[in-house]
Amino acid sequence: MKIVLLGAAGFTGRAAAVLLSRRDDVGELILVDYDIRDAKRLAKALSPKCRWAMADVGKPLELPRLLAGIDAVASAVGPCAEYEKAILLSCAAGGIPTATIGEGTIPAEDRREIDGVFRDAGVPAVVGCGMMPGWTELLAAHFLDAGDGAMNPPAAAPATRYLFFSPARFGGYAFLREVAKGITSAATVPAGAPSGNYFAMPDGSRIGVPEGKAGTRLGWIVGTAAKLGVVGKEFSAALLLWTRGGMPEPAGTPVAVAGVATGDRFARVEDPRGNLGAALLAETAVRLAARPRKTTGLLPLPELFGGQEAEELAVRNGARVVTG
């Protein structure tokens, strides 16, 4: 199969490129990025099956020229609020199954529009194939609520989603920018989550970081930088990127943890390598390319991966699912 990977030179894109290039069922992998030099270097370092191309995904006419003969598109482009809808509509117009990292929630109106164009094109798409959203949805669907009667009754309220990460080892500029722009206030630690400092996001989810300099820096963003508006938060994102190498953290801190919690019940996946979101994106794109089912439109991620399949994917990438 032939797969196009958008945002290939970014943090998640690079990890996804490594994983896809190692798969026997991927015969050709096209690494696409605005910085073609980085895409070219990565392609040459990985495998002869890799090609490279440049595209500005913010321009609707840039993508169609790359989609001829393609079986699926995997998009690791961020920030998703700026680019995701345009990417999805372009891929649907080309009749190409598409998986996106989706670092955020697509508005309901946009979701209906995107679902409609993919249905009209007769192909499927999945949005939110990273850590949050992505693994958080798999955890909520398959691990948090077993529905086994009085010992584990269904949750009375939606689960709280969270992403805990090490700023020194996880995420690129687009991700840190979304964190800096999104966090609104300090929040409590969700049940079963790693200890640290947590902050609320507008959609009700939470972002967590280790205690110490990382927690202090995000607290400053919520307090002082927020008063400076958009400019202050843009500066804060750049500052996070520049200084994250000097943010020590407790021994044993995982690179990233995605989790869900309701009351005292929880499910989380611990990612010691920082590539689990990329692994989910890559696996989703391959499954969409193979088209084991003929369902079209936007597909819920938990319908594509059962609980056992999700856990096996985690284990293959050095991660583990923990419930309680």
Locate the predicted segments by residue.
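ADP-ribose/adenylate-binding Rossmann-like module
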Residues: 79, 90-108
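Residues in the short beta-alpha loop(s) of Rossmann-like NAD(P)-binding domains
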Residues: 9, 34-35
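C-terminal helical cap and adjacent loop that interface with cofactors, partners, or active-site loops
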Residues: 248-324
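Helix N-cap at the beta1-alpha1 junction of Rossmann-like dinucleotide-binding domains, i.e.
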Residues: 35-37, 105
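N-terminal Rossmann NAD(P)H-binding glycine-rich loop of SDR-like oxidoreductase domains
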Residues: 3-22
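Rossmann-fold NAD(P)-binding glycine/threonine-rich loop
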Residues: 102-124
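Active-site-lining helix/loop region of Rossmann-like oxidoreductase modules
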Residues: 6, 145-266
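Conserved Rossmann-fold cofactor-binding substructure of NAD(P)-dependent oxidoreductases
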Residues: 54-70, 79
